[in-house]
Amino acid sequence: MKILVTNDDGPFSPGLAILREAVRGLGEATVVVPETPKSATGLGLTLHKPLRVNRLSLDGEPVYLVSGTPSDVIYIAMNVISGKPDLVVSGVNIGDNLSVQVILTSGTLGAVLQASIEGVPGIAFSAAVDTPEELEEGEYRNFVLRSTKAIVRAVVGEGFPKGVDALNVNFPSVIASDVVVVRPALKRFSTAVVRRKDPQGRPYYWLYGHPVEAEEGSDVHAVLEEGKIAITPLSLSGMLSYSPEALSGIVKKVKEELSR
């Protein structure tokens, strides 16, 4: 089995070290990551400048660095470095990736969703912690490592569920033993814009958000309120589904306007 290991936090993230260790011995693993942190880049691709690839050694193992986004990594890995993998694993992200709002902006998820578009299943791992240090050592690190290893091995052994293209896995900030399959909440944060002025009096803006109340039965509630490991299945076919009848009125009016 060929496994591509990636993330959006760059080569020196303790979450990447956990993921590299978790897949060791499962097959032929290749590690390809953005050369610098690329959080919140979603499915973004670099189309306005060339991409560079470098290589370094971490703990005696090769790690390839791409001067782009996690989505860029997928295409560079497949076409330049290692060929098409059987599985992509991404993470372990510093911070949770909960809700549709965050899933669609996350670089960690962007990598596995981009791979899914190319027909390769993927698993994204995230931990609801505030700092990298929490994944560097101690009982919590061991919990995340053991859980990640167990999930990857279970998926490899059982195979990906039918109709599922990617799995979004989130670990709570506390050691847990309960694992639940849940839907994503719609939102994780309320959004706001702060306007400020620079020394020249020109305005600039910061985007930020406050956590919203967790929807019961959602990934946000399971991880942040109940302290459980949440697995959320994601399907591209769900995004592609449509009902022609639902748009019949709109289509009719457009046709009438164009026929005048």
From Swiss-Prot:
SUPFAM superfamilies xrefs: SurE-like
Whether Nucleotide-binding counts among this entry's keywords is yes
Please state what the protein is called: 5'-nucleotidase SurE
This protein's record includes keyword Hydrolase: yes
Role noted for this protein: Nucleotidase that shows phosphatase activity on nucleoside 5'-monophosphates.
Q: Quote the cofactor binding remark.
A: Binds 1 divalent metal cation per subunit.
Q: Which UniProt keywords apply?
A: Cytoplasm, Hydrolase, Metal-binding, Nucleotide-binding
Q: What is its EC number?
A: 3.1.3.5
* Record-listed a divalent metal cation binding positions: 8-9, 39, 93
Q: Which GO terms describe its cellular component?
A: cytoplasm
Which family does the record assign? Answer: Belongs to the SurE nucleotidase family.
One Pfam family this sequence matches: SurE
HAMAP family, A to Z: SurE
One MF term in GO for this entry? nucleotide binding
Question: Where, subcellularly, is it found?
Answer: Cytoplasm
Q: Where are the transmembrane segments?
A: none
Its required cofactor(s), as named, are:
a divalent metal cation
Q: Which reaction does it catalyse?
A: a ribonucleoside 5'-phosphate + H2O = a ribonucleoside + phosphate
Instruction: Please give the organism.
Output: Thermofilum pendens (strain DSM 2475 / Hrk 5)
